[in-house]
Amino acid sequence: MGCYGDKLANTPHVDTLAKRGMLFKLAWSCAPVCAPARTTIITGMYPPSIGGQHMRSMVPLPEEVQFYPAFLRKQGYYCTNTAKTDYNVSTSDTGWNASSRQAHYKNREPGQPFFAIFNSAVSHESKIRTRPHEKVLDPASVRVPAYHPDNAEIRQDWAQYYDIVSRADAIAGQKLAELDRAGLTEETIVFYYGDHGSGMARGKRWPYNSGLAVPMVVYFPDKWKQLAPKEYKAGGTSDRLVNFVDLAPTLLSLAGVKPPEWMQGHAFAGTHQQKKPKYMFGFRDRMDERYDFIRTVTDGRFHYIRNYNPHFIYGQFVQYNFVTPSTSAWKRDYDAGTLNEAQSHFWNLKPTEELYDLEADPDEVNNLVDSPQHRAKLKKLRKAQQDWCREIRDLGFLPEGEIHSRSQGTTPREMGLDDNKYPFESIFAAASIATERGEAALPQLKKNLGHADSAVRYWGAVGILNRGVGATAASRDELVAALEDESTYVRVVAALALGKFAEEADVRRGVEVLVELSNWTPQTDVFTSMAALNALDKLDDKAAFRLETIKSLPLGGGASPHGRYNGYVKNLVGKTLSDLGASPGKKK
């Protein structure tokens, strides 16, 4: 956007709003994808603390947790949303007076205060690949980030993204003009922000700054200057770190409501402003059909990333993302061996930790984890990330299905606060050891495989998988025994380790277990099926001897929290069969 210094951007309306108001130099969406990001906004809570971090998880909330518009309605506000919701939690009251394409503040009672959200989808990921497209910006003029290869598809998609952001700006201009025609400009506080980073691969879905950073512009008319952030100045900027988790408490504060204790953000405006936070946090978990687990923190300059699934590459095949031409072209060039190290990083296994200097390296391609001069910063941010996970009782350390099974009769949030149901420290310690590298921890990993808690056993198996051939061979007996563990998630990881790294007989054992657990029926668990299918896909030709069974796997029909799970399972089965040269119902 032009107001953020991009010389190619054509965003005159938001630029003008920034000149009249103030922009935050660094704002994060908390999650680099829509549903968990919007869950953060609507609750004022970090989704990993309530079990809502996975796409379309639809978890229940504790009774006292309400969507923030419900608080505004109690204050007399007419609350409208036009029209996207896409939250990862279920509730009987979304808080809105109206939420639809027709919802509008003009429908309020005369003189009634209003709170209105207008969503624009014209710059959505799907619009980057819409063809035909009337070009405005010349693809030759765009700056290709250091992590992307410089090819025609990348340039075309980046140029088209600039064009559709200009359309989003035009829609913002229409809404501001509409407000002005209603005589409400000097009566109304305005926020403008994005959903998450761009829809390009390594933007949306990935918790680098390119996926988390969003524009955040606020305008306070003179009438309401007393409610503005303390540093507010027309045409100014703020170095305060603003996260989507801060929006709900801020909006309540603007309405004169003290944010409830269960909200985890910090109000940056209104009558209950709080001091600037030292850090901002982000996360990545299951993105559509693909599992991952990443936590991040920034102090505004340095960005620390902790990968809890380093045994998965960044660029796992997400069907929806690979429809975009630049994504497929990027993978094509990687397979051809034409990329440099920075451009190849996305398609390789992750390191356990990453540290980037956002000022010196805005594209985040120079990992400073091994830099002696950055050792103190690394330790500080590592501790901040660990402290945050403890503070919020991060539920990401449980396999997704266990979030649901352990919270039967209650909610994931309440379960997560109960040490009897979620012994956090034991599980967190097991995950920390599992996702490091080196053989020294192997005795502890084997011990964890025999632990009473299934999540500790799960991380024991992950730790062996993460360490590869040698650890798998040294733990062969324990892994074979784990194929019969009462936890299906332990079985999946043990089977994947054997399937990837063991001798032929044990490879076949692993494949048999994964094929069995992939079978999603009305009596089975969709989360187990998805975990098993993800693992099966990573075995490629090793699973070919069970091709006919894989072709017959059901693509839906079992219970799930959301209708999109049918598509997730279909995508996973389809990708596995495609790699084996087949398709559902078609013999190889």
Regions inferred by a protein language model and the residue ranges of each:
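Formylglycine-dependent sulfatase
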Residues: 1-347, 362-383
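Long, internal low-complexity/basic segments
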Residues: 23, 213, 338-352, 368-588
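Short hydrophobic beta-strand that contains or immediately precedes a catalytic carboxylate
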Residues: 355-356
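C-terminal helical cap and adjacent loop that interface with cofactors, partners, or active-site loops
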Residues: 359
